Amino acid sequence: MVPAILKMKNALISTITLNPSLDQHLTVDGLVVDGPNRWSRLHRYAGGKGIDVSRAIHEMGGRTIAYGFIGGAVGRAVEIFLDEEGVPFSFTPIRGETRINFIITDSRTNHQTRIDAPGPRISKDEFARFQRKMQRIRPSPDLIVVGGSAPPGIPNNVYYTIIREAKKYGVRTILDADGQWLADGVKAKPYLIKPNVREAEELLGRELPDEMAIIKAARDIVGMGVEIAVISRGKDGIIAATKDTVLKAVPPEVKAKSAVGAGDCTIAGLALKLGAREPLTRACRLAVALGAAAVLTPGTELARRADVEELLPQIKVRNITSQLKKAISTTKTS
């Protein structure tokens, strides 16, 4: 019998990847600097934050469509990989060539090195065509996930614009970006953001040395107009805050093979449940299970449904709102 939490409701999640990629993951047996290297394994995948989220949603049996820019022979390869997985997409064609990213894993040390391309330059006409497509999305999504880097030629406030435009049509947005892209996007007050600790520190301009600091940071982000702030903490799980509630979700210990894609899988879990307007507790449980399942897979592979099913009963979700209120009260009286 399928657990109730894995029964996906009919919500449609659209993802936007402004800078898709063809990810090439190479494994070498001892990376040599200033010397010859020979890879032992090569895997190729369609990449980019939104695309990863769509792939993970599809793996879990959810409904999704991936949007973004695509171009050239590399772009066609990305579409072929998505076709083979059965992931629906509706990209805006461009003259430039979709980028190629390289991930190099040293099998001796298990260290990973990423080499990311900036991406093709997007013309004003190409961006205008993309905007028109977004205004005519059919069927209308229940939730839009947007994130990752933006290629050259894209306006600096692009995420702000996308989020504001979605709000006009009553569509909620999840923003998963960093740096200036995140800082600008937050000003449009998206439904949810999911920075990691480093990204949250950069957004708020302060260090977050412990759990209580992270909890307060999540509440401060909610105070900026975001409905749900989720801060991911790697193997320690996530902290999720709304104006009334703070949740802590923790995965079991797992033998990690690769952390690549874990954050995107976490977003997929949140989107699947919140897109269907299910409780935040269930969304956090599935999100952490998907994130933990992703680190069990090698290279840039994402979570497998079978691993998610095995991990779900082991995910602990606690309401720590009272703990926060007590800490604040103690601080005020001391």
PLM regions: where:
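Structural motif
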Residues: L12-S14, T113, D142-L143, I228
